[in-house]
């Protein structure tokens, strides 16, 4: 979680977007249920977004339309294939340290990813030149969830669950890759430089204003 919090913040600080309002949200108390005033289950994100909307002179209808047009990256690490316990991993959804950002999917909807949001995120990764891996739990192994779905109870929007591969999650020997840290900063910067918009065909696409500005100059 700290790795994703750090890289997300770095991308947020590096990003520049004059077409959208960039938001970086970092929640506390996930491991004890997220029910605190600073947790993902609180109204904190909803309240902040509503205040921004009000400060811009917008009404409630504008707020709900803005949410529907928004896009969230729910960033929380993923389980890499462990060399001592390879059988714990689904053989068709293996992720490895230092081989790129992970997109997480779950048939039981424990992650926010869907076909549309995954496609949008893959496009952002391609623009950033960052490799992508795909993770899903073994169907007979119970896995956890992330803050994305918890936050969705307050602010419904398009979202994809991503993270970085690591070993020994939640232990005192958590291990992750340094290259993945740089990969995540790159893709986060590209995300915060992009404007996610809906086309006339009701498809979502990411328009990179960094690339547009470079083309214009």
What are these regions (language model features)?
Residues 3-11, 44, 120, 183-187:
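Short amphipathic alpha-helical face segments that pack within enzyme cores
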Residues 28-36, 52-53, 60-66, 137-141, ...:
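A domain-level signal for the structural core that forms small-molecule/cofactor-binding pockets
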Residues 78-172, 199:
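Active-site-adjacent substrate-binding region
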Residues 6-96, 196-199:
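Acidic/histidine-rich catalytic neighborhood of metal-dependent amide-processing enzymes
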Residues 49-53, 122, 189-192:
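Generic hydrophobic alpha-helical scaffold/packing signal
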Residues 1-6, 115, 175-178:
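Short, conserved micro-motifs enriched in small and acidic residues
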Residues 10-26, 164-208:
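His/Asp/Glu-rich mid-to-C-terminal helical/loop segments that flank catalytic regions of hydrolases
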Residues 210-217:
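Conserved small/polar residues in nucleotide/adenosyl-binding loops
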């Amino acid at each position: 979680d700290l790795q994703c919090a750090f890289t997300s913040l770095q991308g947020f600080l590096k990003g520049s977007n004059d077409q959208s309002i960039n938001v970086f949200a970092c929640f506390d108390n996930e491991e004890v249920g997220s029910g605190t005033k600073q947790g993902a289950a609180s109204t904190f994100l909803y309240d902040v977004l509503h205040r921004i909307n009000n400060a811009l002179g917008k009404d409630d209808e504008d707020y709900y339309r803005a949410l529907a047009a928004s896009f969230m990256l729910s960033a929380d690490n993923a389980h890499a294939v462990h060399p001592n316990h390879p059988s714990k991993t689904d053989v068709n959804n293996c992720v490895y340290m230092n081989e790129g950002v992970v997109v997480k999917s779950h048939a039981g909807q424990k992650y926010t990813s869907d076909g549309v949001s995954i496609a949008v995120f893959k496009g952002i990764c391609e623009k950033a030149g960052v490799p992508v891996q795909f993770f899903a739990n073994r169907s007979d192994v119970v896995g956890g969830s992330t803050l994305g779905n918890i936050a969705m109870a307050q602010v419904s929007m398009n979202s994809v669950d991503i993270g970085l591969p690591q070993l020994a999650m939640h232990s005192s020997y958590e291990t992750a890759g340094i290259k993945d840290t740089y990969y995540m900063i790159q893709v986060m910067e590209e995300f915060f430089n992009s404007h996610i918009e809906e086309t006339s065909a009701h498809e979502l696409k990411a328009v990179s204003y960094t690339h547009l500005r470079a083309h214009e100059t």
